[in-house]
């Protein structure tokens, strides 16, 4: 008889069940399903029990934390009220000092990183981002050269026009002088 896909996968996965099914018809498969259902029910019960246990223990821990916090506030509130004129400025000072030290350290690390990058770039190593810097430098250089060429070109045109005007003015002046001398 031709084997179906189900037969092939069942025989490959469960060789004893396949043998039982071949010998006893569907009995082997039915027994597998019943034991699988029992297995899956017991597994679900184990999962539920584990979840309930974990949830209960977390609930107890959160309750203990809440009770501890309330007791600490009950004890600490009178002390905080009595010592607040001293504690508040002290806490502000400590917070400012900590902020200052942390920001100073962060700026120091940033400066060291920048100097390290500049050193690598200056010594010929190619740190990350140096290709973008080189590209920007080339673009800026080409724009500067373009502006220099334009300024030179327009300067030549402007100087040439003034030169032509001066020459025309001198020629007119020379003509008028020449006519004055001849008369």
Swiss-Prot record:
Transmembrane spans: 57-77, 99-119
Chief location: other
Membrane topology of this protein: Multi-pass membrane protein
Biased composition (Basic and acidic residues): 159-177
InterPro entries: Oleosin
Sequence repeat segments: 11-20, 21-30
UniProt-recorded name of the protein: Oleosin Bn-V
Ranges where the record places region Polar: 1-47
Span list, region Disordered: 154-183
